[in-house]
A protein has these predicted regions:
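Short, structured loop/turn "capping" segments at alpha-beta junctions
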Residues: 136-137, 198-200, 232
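Short hydrophobic/aromatic-enriched beta-strand-loop microsegments
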Residues: 195-202, 292-298
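Alpha/beta catalytic barrel-like cores
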Residues: 1-95, 105-119, 127-134, 164, ...
């Protein structure tokens, strides 16, 4: 089973995308932002390849204002060689790329202006994947859209407009079910009518099955038949419901018990699974580790190196429990490891524990820090302990120092992101 995640990579500062305000969208500023974002995408692809992550969803803003008149830059020409090199990098690292336009890209709207913008946005997404040189397996995922008081007519509009799209767009388009309006059966019917694949969103199907909706495996197999050889392996979206939030809200992290039950329920099927989760690559690595039948303690120790100061922030007890767990080098206690880590991170961070973790992190930079920087950190900690500064300010300050003094171990941990 191939597993991936969307858009943002935690613990990888070189993978952060740059944004740009529309008022600043000059050709020069756009070129700078695009260049920086392509560097970030290269870093993410290398990260995915090195960690066995085979799917990555590229954020729509990789080319700022890609489908807007605000971007007058011929980016596909200006960055053509570099884009092709990135596509080749993804191929070498066996990373399947995709994109997912946002909620305002609505192909079935009754408003012609909204549709015009949606068509332009889909064309931009397809053009970006074309510029990378990817095949038709690199998909653009789209929800059916709104119901506008007449769901059947709205579904018919989606099909009609999908058929009118340029072939370069249609060969990449995939229809997805949503959590409120269009069920998996609706999305499947639309995909079959359009001649495009359908991606099954597992959480959305659980929340919005609809009357007469088939069960998971039967529906999964029906969706699989919409994927042709040119489309690559079938894809599904997997998320878990966030406790205490509105239905459809994605959880902060993937719980292993639920994920492993889902994997077992596939009964040997191995679709590509895109995780939709707040902690992104963190959950992707967790799920890959849990599925690895030949996992080692060394793998968990690498994971622990990224987690440990985040766990320490939430309490000394869990931190020590994990350290003790990893002493047996012959074992692979992957489920217990993540039970302890996830349990710690789910609890509020006591101020004393957060202070202790911050002091540990400070220890990496204190020797190189100037007298002024040491005094500044001491004042900040006094303000934190007195309630005049929050933990976010403390961690932001430490992140700046870690970057200034090249503390890669810290920068590539989750401490500044979780």
């Amino acid at each position: 089973m191939n597993i991936g995640y969307a858009s943002k990579t935690l613990g990888l500062p070189e993978g952060r995308m740059r944004s740009l305000a529309m008022r600043n969208a000059s050709d020069e500023r756009l070129a700078e932002a695009i260049g920086a974002n392509l560097s970030a995408l290269e870093a993410v692809i290398r990260y995915c390849g090195a960690n066995g992550i085979r799917l990555f969803r590229v954020g729509s803003d990789v080319i700022p204002f890609g489908s807007s008149p605000a971007n007058r830059l011929d980016w596909a020409h200006a960055f053509g060689e570099r884009l092709a090199a990135i596509g080749a990098l993804a191929a070498r690292n066996q990373v399947r790329l995709s994109m997912h336009p946002g909620q305002y890209t609505v192909l079935n709207s009754p408003d012609d202006d909204v549709v015009r913008r949606a068509v332009a946005d889909l064309a931009y997404h397809a053009a970006f994947l074309d510029a990378l040189g990817t095949g038709a397996e690199a998909k653009v995922v789209l929800h059916v859209g709104g119901a506008y008081g007449d769901k059947e007519a709205a579904l018919e509009r989606f099909v009609a407009r999908c058929r009118e799209l340029d072939a370069s767009v249609r060969r990449r388009l995939v229809a997805e079910n949503d959590d409120r309006l269009f069920t998996a059966e609706d999305a499947l019917a639309a995909s079959e009518a359009c001649g495009i694949p359908m991606v099954l969103d597992v959480l959305h199907h659980r929340l919005n099955r609809g009357p007469g909706g088939r069960d998971g495996l039967e529906l999964l197999d029906a969706a699989a038949r919409t994927w042709g050889p040119q489309d690559g392996p079938q894809k599904v979206h997997y998320a878990q419901q966030a406790p205490g939030r509105r239905p459809g809200s994605h959880a902060d992290t993937i719980g292993l018990d639920g994920f492993l039950a889902f994997a077992a329920s596939l009964e040997g099927r191995a679709p590509d699974v895109m995780l939709e989760v707040k902690d992104k690559n963190v959950s992707a690595l967790k799920c890959l580790n849990a599925l690895d039948a030949h996992g080692t303690t060394a793998m968990l120790e690498r994971a622990w190196a990224a987690y440990k100061y985040s766990v320490l922030e939430h309490g000394q007890a869990a931190y020590q429990q994990v350290r003790n767990l990893l002493k047996d080098k012959a074992a692979y206690p992957v489920r217990e490891f993540y039970r302890l880590v996830d349990g710690a991170l789910a609890r509020p961070a006591p101020p004393g524990s957060a202070r202790n973790a911050a002091q540990h992190v400070w220890g990496y930079v204190s020797g190189a820090a100037s007298a002024r920087e040491r005094a500044s950190f001491a004042r900040l900690m006094e303000r934190y302990e007195g309630g005049q500064a929050d933990l976010v300010a403390v961690k932001r300050h430490l992140a700046r120092l870690a970057g200034r003094y090249g503390q890669e171990y810290l920068l590539h941990s989750y401490y500044f992101d979780l």
